[in-house]
């Protein structure tokens, strides 16, 4: 087709419309058709067209027997009468006229039956109108960029205009009012001109071709058999039988019964879809042409006709329509109303979004329900929050209903009965399928309990009690231990109160292992949670039975595996991936990264410290450990084919558990060395307490664990002592497992450990010691920290300390008891989600299990948890159906009977269970009551788009809308065979199960209906399927859905032969819209066209601006499009939010959730910025999103923090930001600034609110302060140095002092800025110059100095600089620090000799320098002070602390004589130092290197013996000399200090560096015993030296 198009603009009410004025010539040669003309004009009066518009629920359009009246026909003239008869019948039935038919009936010759393209002429506007429109539009268009350029927030980038907010971010979906104009910025943020209306200006006259096509494309009849529909509703994928087929694209021929064509070949819901269809199909059929929004309706219709002709040609050449079905299906998926675009948002559900099925609906009555009680978790089972439980704002209901796929309505009593039926089938599978009870499952794992009605817990518990008597005794209970996957903290107490019939996980302990051990070092927590953050506090666990039973695990098939794979795919493979929807290829790539990461010491994704986690799991008391397959074998790869790096460690622990792990438990965590450690001890079988002695088995059982989570850990010489219990005194222990620099070394036998030198012996109190070299941190693929596990030497090879369960009747009302027998169990989660598909029979999981039972036995496995054995769905909608792990199924009775599932066939399952039973293992089935995946049959259901809680998504296009779901099973599957099949039998055997009223409904289960075929009425809802909001077709005007049922018949008029040209048109007065369903002008109706929402008022014309419609507020731009998902800021600065349906959020909306975000609305305004709600200050950003757990700086520069839960401004508390800066929020919630007193702390905060730590602050008064680097406290009374090396002194008030100061006896000086003066002079206010030492800063006296100005100054005795001539007879220090002397004549002495000073003292000058200190001159021992003046008649304490005396006349030092000074008598010995003062009785004194002693009688002791001094302390004198140090006196080893005083009752470090302790009574050194010293116990060995540090 060749087409020339001219575009014109016409101004209508200040809006501009693009008019397309086109002429088209379609060449007949394009189709090889001969050219013929129609002699008779077709009628164009719409009023004469056949229009059918019956009420959808009451009126009929036609009966099955009535054909639609023809408007044109290709039949031969012989068919005319028949057509006339049909028309007449149609008139009678529908009460309408068909004048067009009569006209059409005159064109019956063969040539006229062929399709011939005609030229379309556009009419309706004068040249003057078009010219004016063009000129004005050009001027208007040119002015727009200049207007935008004037806006300060708008910037042009790559030719487009963007609006930037105050933070520099581009605003999207945003409209702003500026003056009298409104500017709109679309979803990309780019400005979009909304002043133009795209409307069709062509003539509304109907072409002859359009009439012919309409006549032949009408439905063959309105009988439902002529339509492909879902529950009689037409969909975008519907096909129908037209009246005629344009055979080979040339000749209209009556259709046959199999000649179905796509509905979209003849009808489209709007112009945009029609244009998209033409453009899409042009490519399919080989037409090189693209149509735009400016294309007229007439040209678009002609293009669609050409596409239809080409389609028919290709059908003829291909001889099938398979290709067409594929093309149409693919096209449908491209249209937003028929794909996920109209189902958004995608952030509130694991599968992007949820659909809630309406309970009451006239449109789909077969899908109604009286139940669908959502979120009836243990926390909310009755519909009200259980008062027993603590409210958790992060998990308000303890779970939610919509998890995955088709969500089973577990509140429906009929469904509840079916769940019981299925449970019975599952547990009796061997008996039912193979007539072999030995192949029955023993127990179940309840999947995703927090996502189903908690009544299922009651039903399953009651069945287990009735069928197995688990409440009768522990033996029965332990043979049928069923577990629950329930993550809420409320679930375990719920199960406990219900009788502990089912066992829940210890999720707290899982989290403790995750954060203490498995995470990278920079985010790891301490080790203390491993003791206390658990269902069992293990600091001291000497209980016979724990309060609640539980099982524990580190990882699982769906925990800490698929999350990591998801993260890898998102980060490194497909950044556009969402949630858990990824392909097998992406999974395979991710596992290459995952497996390599597992082998690294520095991991990016996988878990650290797996051996440490398993050490705790497999040695802890009070919970059944569950080992995960993927920790021993790679998650991917064939089953059990590839061991992980942690396999040997876990296997070693498993085998040791059977042999050693028993008894009470004690755990400790404390700081030691440069880090912290965790210790755990099990005392052995028969010893619950540390003091229990037990028996022989006790002595050969038990285990000790020491671990840490810091790879740089060192004991730093400290000792760790493990109290292994009284039963293990003086016993050898050997290593079972030790971390090394390369990994983890394991030792299977005593001999292996002995050979490695890893054997220790406990002391007589049962302590096992670890010294400095024993415990060192390492970093390798297995351990990031350190690990040691020790067990007793001497256990028999076949020792098994496990305990059998008792058959004594239970009397406490509980079924499961976590006692020693329960502790003896080990679960094995025997599969991975991601294991590879078998390539041959021997690779199937169940085959491999049967062949490896002995291995599981050797590990001590007691309960084998099988993978879910259901044949998987392959719909690929979610990870589970991609990897086919068994959790995505459509027939839950099919355990590999119809075909092999991922794990094998039903027969292989039977063999695996029997093999496990043969070795005494119990086998657990996976019971998955929550969801079912894509069924083979579809239904139309009335649905509402909701979040995972079932709360409607505000503004969603899916609101009580019809939607096609995959919710109906085949009716000929195993569900049909076994569904409800056992209910009668169960009711007879266990009648109590059918009379007990369930908590959520108050009703008993209902066995009266046997569910043989699943359908929507049994489901709560489903996930969104990407079919779009309008996939079930409807009339936009009446909102009626097209339906082909005889009693609710409603079809588009196009299918009844009427020519319908829909879309927006300009009629010379305004903009109107013709319905795509009827062709009539729309009035008082919303219309969606090209994804835009319009409203046409009561007069039929398009509205603009703010409008209130049916009580709701909307805003329509100049081009008539409604604001949707858009924030509009009006001229007053108020923000309004228009939802996806165009409605403005109003006051009654209050808080509204948008995905994970919240907004607040009042009086039609959206909260932006600081807002007070119910008395609480909250903050909403520029887009209205509430700030939670965020620090916000508001426009006034103030800092606030808003609570992570309620969003309220936090007050009177400290907070820290992500960079480590701290703030204090005052009583008004604003971060304080400046100096503040908080509690007893004096703190300072910058102007931005950040607390000052480790830095100086200058106050407004100019005072300098310093604040501590850790606490932020203001420093007082202390010196501090800044980064530049300047020193300051902070006074009592914290301010840096200035001027002259005397601090701690030092005379110092500080500048006006607080800096201390060092190495420089200061001119005081008295005009005098002083100098302060360069190192100490102390004022200098009697010294010559060189100041910073380069000048030399002589500082006198008073510290003031003087003229040298005034220092006669004085000493002083010169600039080099040497002490010089001016004689009494004022002359500087440069020689040597004695000189008298001005105060009549004497100095001795040697080579010009005055001597100081001890000197020997001419045989005399003399002493000179620091200023060089000789000491006479005075005592001098030397640098060695000893006292000497110098004669008052000669100055000679006194030797071997007594001297009385100031009334005290001193004796100076051989070395000239004072020995004693005053009364010498009972005193020692130094005589050179010897110590001597005066007895209490005052006699100098010269012999040997024990003596008591004046203080009652004991000494020993030997040959006149007092003994010191470690000595042997008689038979005693004793110790005397440096003064000769005997040590008693104290620990002493002796000369060999060792610490010894001496008895408090005898003073004898103790050996080979513990002793408490300063509150801590130490062990002292055979030589008396301390060996170990023990406990506090």
UniProtKB/Swiss-Prot annotation:
Disulfide bond as UniProt keyword: no
Pfam families per record: Choline_bind_1, Choline_bind_3, Glyco_hydro_70, KxYKxGKxW_sig
Phylogenetic lineage: Bacteria, Bacillati, Bacillota, Bacilli, Lactobacillales
Function according to Swiss-Prot or TrEMBL: Production of extracellular glucans, that are thought to play a key role in the development of the dental plaque because of their ability to adhere to smooth surfaces and mediate the aggregation of bacterial cells and food debris.
Region spans: Catalytic: 200-1044
Misc. remarks from the entry: GTF-I synthesizes water-insoluble glucans (alpha 1,3-linked glucose and some 1,6 linkages), GTF-S synthesizes water-soluble glucans (alpha 1,6-glucose). GTF-SI synthesizes both forms of glucans.
Cleavable signal peptide: 1-38
Organism field: Streptococcus downei
Enzymatic class: transferase
Keyword set includes Signal: yes
Similarity comment: family membership: Belongs to the glycosyl hydrolase 70 family.
Compositionally biased spans, kind Low complexity: 39-108
Protein's name according to its UniProt entry: Glucosyltransferase-I
GO cellular component: extracellular region
């Amino acid at each position: 087709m060749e087409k020339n198009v001219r575009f014109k603009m016409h101004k209508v009410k200040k809006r501009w419309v693009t008019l397309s004025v086109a002429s088209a010539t379609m060449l007949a040669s394009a189709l090889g058709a001969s050219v013929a003309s129609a002699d008779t004009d077709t009628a164009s009066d719409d009023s004469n067209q056949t229009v059918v518009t019956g009420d959808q629920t009451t009126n009929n359009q036609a009966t099955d027997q009535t054909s639609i009246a023809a408007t044109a026909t290709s039949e031969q003239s012989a068919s005319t009468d028949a057509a006339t008869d049909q028309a007449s019948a149609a008139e009678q039935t529908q009460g309408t006229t068909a004048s067009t038919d009569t006209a059409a009936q005159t064109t019956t010759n063969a040539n006229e039956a062929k399709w011939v393209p005609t030229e379309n002429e556009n009419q309706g506007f004068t040249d003057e109108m078009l010219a004016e429109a063009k000129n004005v539009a050009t001027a208007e268009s040119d002015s727009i960029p200049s207007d935008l350029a004037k806006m300060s927030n708008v910037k042009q980038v790559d030719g487009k205009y963007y609006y930037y907010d105050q933070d520099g971010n581009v605003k999207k979906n945003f409209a702003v009012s500026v003056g009298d104009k409104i500017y709109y910025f679309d979803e990309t943020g780019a400005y979009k001109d909304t002043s133009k209306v795209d409307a069709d200006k062509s003539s509304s006259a109907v072409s002859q071709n359009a009439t012919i096509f309409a006549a032949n494309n009408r439905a063959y009849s309105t009988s439902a058999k002529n339509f492909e529909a879902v529950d009689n509703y037409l969909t975008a994928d519907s096909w129908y039988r037209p009246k005629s087929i344009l055979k080979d694209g040339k000749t209209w021929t009556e259709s046959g019964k199999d000649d179905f064509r796509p509905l979209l070949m003849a009808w489209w819901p709007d112009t945009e879809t029609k244009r998209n269809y033409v453009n899409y199909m042009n490519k399919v059929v080989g037409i090189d042409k693209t149509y735009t929004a400016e294309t007229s309706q007439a040209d678009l219709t002609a293009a669609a006709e050409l596409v239809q002709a080409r389609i028919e040609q290709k059908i003829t050449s291909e001889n099938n329509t398979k290709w067409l079905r594929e093309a149409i299906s693919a096209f449908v998926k491209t249209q937003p109303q028929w794909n996920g675009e109209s189902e958004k948002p995608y952030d509130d559900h694991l599968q992007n979004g949820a659909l809630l099925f309406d309970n009451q609906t006239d449109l789909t009555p077969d899908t109604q329900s009286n139940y669908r009680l959502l979120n009836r978790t243990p926390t909310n089972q009755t519909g009200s929050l259980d008062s027993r439980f603590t409210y958790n704002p992060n998990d308000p209901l303890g779970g939610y209903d919509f998890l995955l796929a088709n969500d089973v309505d577990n509140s429906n009593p009929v469904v509840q009965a079916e769940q019981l039926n299925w449970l019975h089938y599952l547990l009796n599978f061997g008996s039912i399928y193979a007539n072999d009870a030995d192949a029955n499952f023993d127990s179940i794992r309840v999947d995703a309990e927090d996502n189903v009605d908690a009544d299922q817990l009651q039903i399953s518990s009651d069945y287990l009690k009735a069928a197995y008597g688990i409440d009768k005794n522990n033996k029965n209970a332990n043979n049928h231990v069923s577990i629950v996957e329930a993550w809420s903290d409320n679930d375990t107490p719920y199960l406990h109160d219900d009788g502990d019939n089912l066992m829940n996980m210890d999720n707290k302990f899982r989290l403790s292992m995750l954060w203490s051990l498995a995470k990278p070092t920079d985010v790891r927590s301490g080790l203390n949670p491993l003791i206390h953050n658990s269902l069992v506090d293990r600091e001291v666990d000497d209980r016979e039975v724990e309060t609640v039973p539980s099982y524990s695990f580190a990882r699982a098939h769906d925990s800490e595996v698929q999350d990591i794979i998801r993260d890898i795919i998102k980060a490194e493979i497909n950044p556009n991936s969402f949630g858990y929807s990824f392909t097998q290829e992406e999974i395979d790539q991710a596992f290459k990264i995952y497996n390599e990461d597992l082998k690294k010491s520095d991991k990016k994704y996988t878990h650290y410290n797996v051996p440490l986690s398993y050490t705790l799991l497999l040695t802890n008391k009070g919970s059944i450990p569950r080992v995960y397959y993927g920790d021993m074998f790679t998650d991917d790869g064939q089953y059990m084919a590839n061991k992980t790096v942690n396999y040997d460690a876990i296997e070693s622990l498993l085998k040791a558990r059977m042999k050693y792990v028993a008894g009470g438990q004690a755990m400790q965590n404390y700081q030691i060395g440069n880090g912290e450690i965790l210790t755990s001890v099990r005392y052995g079988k028969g010893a619950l307490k540390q003091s229990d002695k037990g028996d022989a088995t006790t002595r050969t059982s038990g285990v000790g664990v020491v671990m840490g989570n810091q790879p740089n850990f060192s004991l730093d010489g400290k000792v760790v002592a493990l109290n292994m219990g009284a039963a293990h005194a003086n016993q050898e222990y050997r290593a079972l497992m030790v971390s090394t620099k390369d990994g983890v070394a394991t030792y299977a036998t005593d001999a292996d450990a002995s050979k490695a030198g890893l054997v220790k012996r406990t002391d007589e109190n049962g302590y096992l010691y670890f010294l400095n070299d024993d415990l060192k941190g390492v970093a390798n693929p297995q351990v990031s920290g350190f690990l040691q596990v020790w067990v007793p030497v001497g256990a028999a090879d076949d020792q098994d300390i496990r305990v059998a369960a008792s058959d004594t009747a239970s009397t406490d009302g509980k079924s499961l008891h976590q006692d020693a027998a329960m502790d003896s169990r080990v679960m094995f989660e025997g599969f991975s989600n991601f294991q590879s598909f078998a390539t041959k029979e021997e690779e199937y999981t169940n085959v491999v299990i049967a062949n490896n039972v002995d291995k599981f036995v050797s590990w001590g496995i007691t309960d084998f948890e099988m993978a879910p054995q259901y044949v998987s769905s392959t719909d690929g909608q979610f990870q589970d159906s991609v990897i086919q792990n068994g959790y995505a199924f459509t027939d839950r009775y099919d355990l590999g009977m119809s075909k092999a599932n991922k794990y094998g066939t039903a027969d292989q399952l039977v063999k695996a269970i029997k093999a496990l039973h043969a070795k005494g293992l119990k086998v657990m089935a996976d019971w998955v009551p929550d969801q079912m995946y894509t069924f083979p049959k579809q239904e139309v259901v009335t649905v509402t788009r909701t979040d995972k809680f079932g709360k409607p998504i505000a503004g969603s296009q899916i609101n009580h809308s019809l939607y096609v779901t995959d919710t109906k099973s085949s009716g000929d599957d195993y569900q049909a065979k076994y569904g409800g099949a056992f209910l009668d039998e169960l009711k007879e055997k266990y009648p109590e199960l059918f009379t007990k009223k369930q908590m959520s409904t108050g009703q008993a289960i209902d066995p009266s209906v046997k569910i043989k075929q699943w359908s929507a009425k049994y489901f709560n809802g489903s996930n969104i399927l990407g079919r779009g909001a309008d996939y079930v077709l409807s009339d936009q005007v009446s909102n009626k859905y097209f339906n082909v049922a005889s009693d609710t018949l409603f079809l588009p008029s196009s299918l009844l032969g009427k020519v319908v040209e829909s879309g927006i048109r300009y009629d010379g007065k305004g903009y109107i819209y013709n319905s795509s369903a009827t062709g009539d002008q729309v009035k008082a109706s919303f219309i969606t066209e090209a994804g835009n929402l319009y409203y046409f008022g009561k007069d039929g014309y398009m509205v603009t601006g703010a409008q209130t419609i049916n009580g709701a507020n909307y805003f329509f731009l100049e081009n008539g499009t409604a604001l949707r998902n858009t924030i509009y800021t009006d001229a007053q600065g108020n923000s309004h939010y228009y939802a996806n349906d165009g409605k403005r959020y109003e006051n009654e909306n209050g808080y509204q959730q948008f995905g994970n975000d919240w907004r607040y609305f009042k009086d039609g305004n959206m909260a932006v910025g600081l807002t007070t709600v119910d008395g609480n200050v909250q903050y909403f950003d520029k887009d209205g999103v509430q700030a939670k757990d965020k620090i916000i700086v508001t426009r006034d520069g103030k800092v606030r923090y808003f609570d992570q839960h309620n969003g309220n401004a936090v007050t009177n508390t400290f907070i820290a930001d992500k960079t480590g800066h701290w703030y204090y929020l005052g009583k008004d919630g604003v971060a304080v600034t400046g100096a503040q007193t908080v509690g007893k702390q004096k703190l300072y905060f910058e102007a931005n609110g950040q607390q000052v730590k480790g830095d100086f602050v200058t106050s407004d008064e100019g005072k300098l302060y310093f604040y501590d680097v850790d606490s932020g406290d203001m420093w007082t009374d202390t010196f501090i140095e800044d980064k530049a090396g300047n020193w300051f002194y902070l006074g009592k008030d914290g301010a840096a002092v200035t001027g002259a100061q005397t601090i701690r006896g030092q005379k110092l000086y500080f500048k006006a800025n607080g800096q201390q003066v060092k190495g420089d002079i200061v001119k005081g206010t008295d005009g005098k110059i002083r100098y302060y030492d360069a190192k100490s800063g102390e004022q200098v006296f009697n010294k010559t100095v060189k100041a910073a100005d380069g000048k030399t100054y002589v500082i006198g005795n008073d510290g003031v600089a003087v003229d040298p001539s005034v220092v006669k007879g004085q000493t002083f220090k010169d600039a080099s620090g040497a002490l010089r002397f001016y004689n009494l004549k004022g002359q500087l002495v440069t020689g040597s000799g004695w000189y008298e000073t001005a105060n009549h003292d004497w100095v001795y000058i040697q080579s010009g320098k005055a001597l100081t200190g001890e000197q020997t001159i001419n045989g005399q021992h003399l002493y000179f002070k620091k200023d060089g003046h000789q000491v006479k008649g005075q005592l001098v304490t030397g640098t060695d602390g000893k006292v000497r005396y110098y004669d008052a006349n000669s100055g000679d030092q006194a030797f071997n004589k007594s001297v009385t000074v100031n009334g005290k008598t001193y004796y100076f010995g051989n070395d000239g130092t004072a020995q004693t003062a005053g009364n010498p009785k009972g005193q020692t004194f130094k005589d050179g290197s010897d110590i001597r002693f005066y007895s209490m009688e005052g006699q100098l002791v010269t012999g040997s013996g024990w003596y008591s001094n004046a203080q009652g302390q004991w000494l020993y004198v030997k040959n006149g000399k007092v003994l010191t140090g470690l000595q042997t006196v008689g038979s005693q080893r004793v110790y005397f200090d440096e003064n000769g005083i005997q040590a008693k009752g104290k620990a002493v470090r002796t000369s060999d560096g060792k610490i010894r302790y001496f008895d408090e009574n005898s003073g004898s050194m103790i050996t080979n015993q513990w002793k408490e010293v300063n509150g801590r116990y130490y062990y002292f060995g055979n030589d008396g030296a301390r060996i170990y540090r023990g406990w506090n």
